Amino acid sequence: MEMELEPELEEELGVSLDELRKWIEEQVDSSEAVQKRKADLEQLQEWVEQREKEVADIDALCSNASESVVQCEALVKEVYSNMGLVYRESSSDDEGGKANPSEVIEIDDDDDDDVIAVGCLVPPKKSLTQAKDPALKEASAALQRTSQQVQNLAQTVNRTAQSGVTTPVKTGGPPGQGPLAVPAVFMSSAPRNTPTQPNPNIKQDSIKINMTLLGKKRTKTWHRGTLVAIKQVGNNLKYKVRFENKGKSLLSGNHVAFEYHPTLERLFVGARVVARYKDGNQVWLYAGVVAEMPNSKNRMRFLIFFDDGYASYVGLPELYPICRPLKKTWEDIEDASCRDFIEEYITSYPNRPMVLLKPGQIIKTEWEGTWWKSRVEEVDGSLVKMLFLDDKRSEWIYRGSTRLEPMFNLKMNTANSQEKKMAGQQRQRPNMGALRTKGPVVQYTSDNSAAASTGGGAATPGTPTRPVAPQPAGPPQPSRTESPSFKSQMAKKSTGQLALQPRQGMPSDLQPKPIINALQTNTSRLFLLQSGPVHTLTPITPAPQTVQTAISTYTNERVPQEPSYQAPNDRLFYLTHNCSPECLKRIRPTRPNLHRGRNPLLTPLLYEFRRMTGRRRLNRKMSFHVIYKSPCGLSLRNMTEIQRYLFQTQCDFIFLEMFCLDPYVLVDRRFQPQRPFYFIRDITSGREDIPLSCVNEIDNTPPPSVAYSKERIPEDGVYINTSADFLVGCDCTDGCRDKSKCSCHQLTLQATGCTPGGQINPNAGYHYKRLDECLPTGIYECNKRCRCNMQMCTNRLVQHGLQVRLQLFKTQNKGWGIRCLDDIAKGSFVCIYAGKILTDDFADKEGLEMGDEYFANLDHIESVENFKEGYESEAHCSDSEGSGVDMSRVKLPASSRHGKSNKMEERNSSTTGKSQDDSSEESDDEKDDDSNEDDSDSSDDTFVKDTYYTTSSVWRSYTTRRQAKGLKEESQDSKDGMSVSAGEDRKPPHMPEETGKSKVASWLTNQSSTSANQSVKVEGGIKTEKKDVMTLSDSDDVQTISSGSDDNKEREKKTQAVVKRQVAVKSTRGIALKSHSMMVKSGGGGAGGGGSGPSHGHGGGGGDNGPKNTRLFFDGEESCYIIDAKLEGNLGRYLNHSCSPNLFVQNVFVDTHDLRFPWVAFFASKRIRAGTELTWDYNYEVGSVEGKELLCCCGSTECRGRLLQIIKTEWEGTWW
């Protein structure tokens, strides 16, 4: 039929079927829907091809990743074996593959010893979108597993050794799925036990006959040998070793070592090992003690203290474990000085005082009993490379060695302080001068593991941390808890009441009132502010209608915004004229405090002065210079011209301290707090001339309730005579610009004659209303008896009160602090320290009852007298023309150890005869061989304090072995130098010339003549010998000293009553004296040109010939007064501590010239940027407060780590 219809259709339609089919296809192709569908299909095809290519790439990546993981595993195994770690392989099934994946990774931060919790995104078990291609799905799953395994491997490798056994994060997928099921990696390290004790779970390796060991020879070096026999000698086993280089020895278990390298699990601080020491091309094996475990700071090396005094870093392949070490490993060290040091080091670990040094610093270093000028070449972990400038010889020294001058000073100062405490001459309070010298400081470091075990980084002393999130519904809780024993050792600073309480001294209408309780779930940051000077900013929720109304009314109110200063654009021209008051007549204000509350450095600009900064390029260096232009067009290029202009125009509303020529101090840089939770416009309630605002950007905790007072308040028993009849006044009419004619300036200048050298400084005092550095002898300002103009006088600064704009703010981890709102120029006056003035006895009682965290010592008299004493006491480290100072006659005062034999005798006896330990060498043919070896390789005097400082013993860290022969030859001279008897004449020999070296030698001779057995006078004129024997009572509060005779029983009772106080007081002296005061005799003998008096009040009048303490002239007073700002004071109480402070303390006499009652003022020691916290150095003396320990977390690069440290003292072989 079709064949029949085709001709009919073709005839009827007039077209053939092929043509019709072709036409239909053309019409379909021309349709938009069909074309769109076709394009989609083409694009889909391209996507499929691209996906196939990606799958191929992923397969290649997976293959490469699998190979990389295998290579990484091999490298990790090699690293583990080199480091002594145990590498174990286990699949996810062995470790519980069905366990939930971990969501938190603990990272041990080596920099600040904090444990940070980092949230880890766990991969989902199932993909959100199912892939259509099975190959693509499998490749994606394999890639996901591989990336997770690589992450686990990186996490395991980066974990430090102290973090214990590391368990990798489990993947979300089922265990063992896919071709890349790589076993997990585990790091097994020493458990977190006591860092100075061995792991009790590890058994000792057995010692068998014919095994290869290392044995100790008579030359103190260790050599390889074979164990030939084990003998029972008494209750101990002896091991007979035949050395490879001929010879036999019968040795004890602590004098033989295994030949293999130990694992990390077997090592700890204090472990006895044999290590290789390299000196050029020579290599020896010596016994030593592990002082540091590997960590990132020492580049994964072990610090070894060798028995002969060396200190060196070695790797694990260079260590060999001692077979049977003693329980107290330091008892195996023959040298007594080194043994004592190691014992003290291990017992006090991980607290290690070390000198903070930087390359290029110049310090004094001891070598062969003489102090030499040396330069820091390189610092490597706990070691420092010192270059002796005289002979260009370099040497590596442990940074905690007393061969370094700062450490020597610290040890001597601690010993002297303990002696004075025992003798009742010094109260147990720290000396906390406000400024330390710029030289190296002693830093207290802690081991990472020990720090981690305490729960993270410690907060700054005296300030418990607060939660970051606001909690107005209840009292905030500390975010970190501390044990009671830890709290009892901390001198905590008060961070305020937990709840809002009425503020003392404030009217009831100014009390901060919480308006509405905040909900913790509220994420919006809306604030409701109370009108008035005091505001409580509280996040609120837009719930009730009444609250909505309040929000709409007060939402736009924030912390007051200060209008910005706009410099005028018009040019200012100068016409020649003589400046007079008419130049400022146009701008002279009707009231002098028109711009009070603004930045004082901006005030001249507000009165139409111009401050312009010019620059010039000289020798490719850009320099800047600030020029002021007066309203009359006169250019003022320096402070002299500015001062002259102010006096010519009689300007009494703009003052000299309001001008600054430092181009880096910006006068219009304002600091604005970031959306605080709590804000107070002025916490002083108008008592200060400048408002002191308060903000809390952390939570809504208010500041502590303290009665504000900008003046000092004498308490009962304190009388300050401020009568003008007892003041010295001047008659200046030139604003006291001429210091030679001003009586008050002359008081300041003449006082500088009390400094070392006795020379008067003609430039002392204020320099254009600024003080660049501390003046230890104090500044005498003009007073009410002077006839000079109070506003124009250049010698009136502190008495004008607060001028800079400051703000009280809540810090993250230091409680409340003070920061500046504007830039502060160097030398500018900031504020004073005010509070109640207490007597010493009353301060002791109140400090024990209420706390001593806000005590400050008015010790100006002691500061100046100690400063004068320090001239001779620190002469041995002065930069004189002599290359060094002989310390062969210096002796540690009041040493608690007796009967110690001479070190050279010990050295000779240890090298010439048989060893005195339990090791004995047989008389075999090895004697001839041993006798040819260097017998001088005996113990040098190292690491430790010593009773006498001979040529061979000065608390040294280590000495070079090449010095042994020289020391041995000088041994007889050292013995002669130490044989000074107590009955000899104590006067120094006559010196023909008083050169730098002769003065030092004279002083050292005086020191050596004061032996441990001193003659003291008793009733009846009979002299008895006093033996210094320290007796420690069972109580932690009392530490006494007994003379060993019945004659001093009464004195012992007095001592117990004095030294039991444990009050920490800040010192208000402006400088930190070098720790050499212990070198000055504290007794009554006043021979030679050395000390000028005792360093504290109780020391005065100790002998008939000694100079009398100045304080004794004030009705026999013996102790200084205390400023207590705990309950009543000014903003100075909030200034925190820093080891790199930006403020220094200066004693200023304003209303009285009584040396006991200076004003305590703070000045800027450097340029301070707006928004920077203001800090000063409390300068606590380590070990000065018994039973107290304060950690420092100031964050400075020069942080010393400790403010107060419990110091251990050796007595009868035990550390207390």
From Swiss-Prot:
Residues 1082-1105 have a biased composition (Gly residues). Pfam families: DUF5604, MBD, Pre-SET, SET, Tudor_4, Tudor_5. Residues 38-61 form a coiled coil. Keywords: Chromatin regulator, Chromosome, Coiled coil, Metal-binding, Methyltransferase, Nucleus, Repeat, Repressor, S-adenosyl-L-methionine, Transcription, Transcription regulation, Transferase, Zinc. SMART domains: MBD, PreSET, SET, TUDOR. Residues 467-478 have a biased composition (Pro residues). Zn(2+) 1 binds at C730, C732, C736, C742. Residues 804-1179 form the SET domain. The keyword Lyase does not apply. Its EC number is 2.1.1.354. Zn(2+) 2 binds at C730, C744, C782, C786. Zn(2+) 3 binds at C736, C782, C788, C793. GO terms for biological process: DNA methylation-dependent constitutive heterochromatin formation; heterochromatin organization; methylation; negative regulation of gene expression. GO terms for molecular function: DNA binding; histone H3K4 trimethyltransferase activity; histone H3K9 methyltransferase activity; promoter-specific chromatin binding; zinc ion binding. Residues 595-666 form the MBD domain. It is found in: Nucleus; Chromosome. Residues 966-976, 983-997, 1020-1029, 1046-1055 have a biased composition (Basic and acidic residues). Residues 918-940 have a biased composition (Acidic residues). S-adenosyl-L-methionine binds at K814, G815, W816, D852, Y854, R1133, N1136, H1137. Belongs to the class V-like SAM-binding methyltransferase superfamily. Histone-lysine methyltransferase family. Suvar3-9 subfamily. PANTHER family: HISTONE-LYSINE N-METHYLTRANSFERASE EGGLESS (PTHR46024), HISTONE-LYSINE N-METHYLTRANSFERASE SETDB1 (PTHR46024:SF2). This is Histone-lysine N-methyltransferase SETDB1-B. It comes from Danio rerio. The gene is setdb1b.
